[in-house]
Amino acid sequence: MRRTGAYQVVKPRHLRFVTLNLWGENGPWEARLELVADKLAGVLPDVVALQEVREVPGSVTNQAALIAKARGWNHVFAPSTAWGGGQEGLAILSKFPIGAHDFRVLPHSQEDEGRIVLSARVDTEFGETWVHTTHLSFREHEGRKREDQVLVVDEVVQAHKNDAPQVVMGDFNAVPHSDEVRWLSGLTTLAGRRAYYQDAWDMIHPDEPGYTWSKDNHYRERMYWLRADRRLDYIFVTPTRRDRRGTVHEARLLFDEPMVLGGGERIFASDHFGVLAEVQYLTEDPAAGPPPTSTSGG
């Protein structure tokens, strides 16, 4: 895979995070993986979360391992389900060393494939921080199941709580006004519990849709029964500290433009668009004033 592209170096007090549902080996997956690796080379992320990562012995090398090798990164992978002679799961990649890592199985129905949350301790230049990724049930009528799943995801985050901000990324298969996402955003109660995470996109673009499942992406048509133009992929950050750690400074879509091959074929990196967010990790003097806040809901 080529290492091309350029992007401004991340601000010295920030870390840059990216999430993408990789869509396994669907479509021209080898060309898509090239596109993913090239784009990542250009945006210089510190940590990447991938969902629908495939590994099939004898035919598909672990896709996260291929991307990590192309970038010289570290990575961890956890399978969530087995099918087609191989495994599918989640991965976390980073230019920093990855220490302890584990996963937890999420509640899921018999008709659904396995669901997990993968957690990894990333040893950054600012110290250790825990990063989590997940991929929730995809059927639109499974909102109740996704509610159960986000409750467990929050339990996992709380179990790994330390002094640094934590980030939860992935394909939540739920829109911002769903109860499961509103709960994560601190706007409703589930099972008598409350939580609050910053929705990175909403913190920066409260009035923009940020669709990651878009009618502009022709790969989406393979799952034509799922409504298009929805924001399903998120980067959530634990609350901003008084010293400004955890402040979201940037959020934008990624992998939302196609590459045109020699024969005129347009390929996207995936059937989903990705999300990029930049989060502050270096402390500032609290006397500098309170961090910026969003006036938006979830």
How does the language model describe each region?
Residues 15-22, 36-60, 93, 120, ...:
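Active-site beta-strand/loop signature of hydrolases that rely on acidic residues for catalysis
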Residues 34-36, 64-68, 110, 148-150, ...:
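Glycine-rich, phosphate-binding/catalytic loops in enzymes
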Residues 25-27, 55-59, 83-85, 139-141, ...:
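Active-site environment of divalent metal-dependent phosphoester hydrolases
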Residues 2-12, 29, 47, 51-136, ...:
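Structured beta-strand-rich core segments of catalytic domains in phosphoester-bond hydrolases
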Residues 25-29, 102, 208-212:
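Short, solvent-exposed loop/turn elements at domain surfaces
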Residues 142-155:
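Alpha-helical scaffold elements lining the catalytic groove of polysaccharide deacetylases
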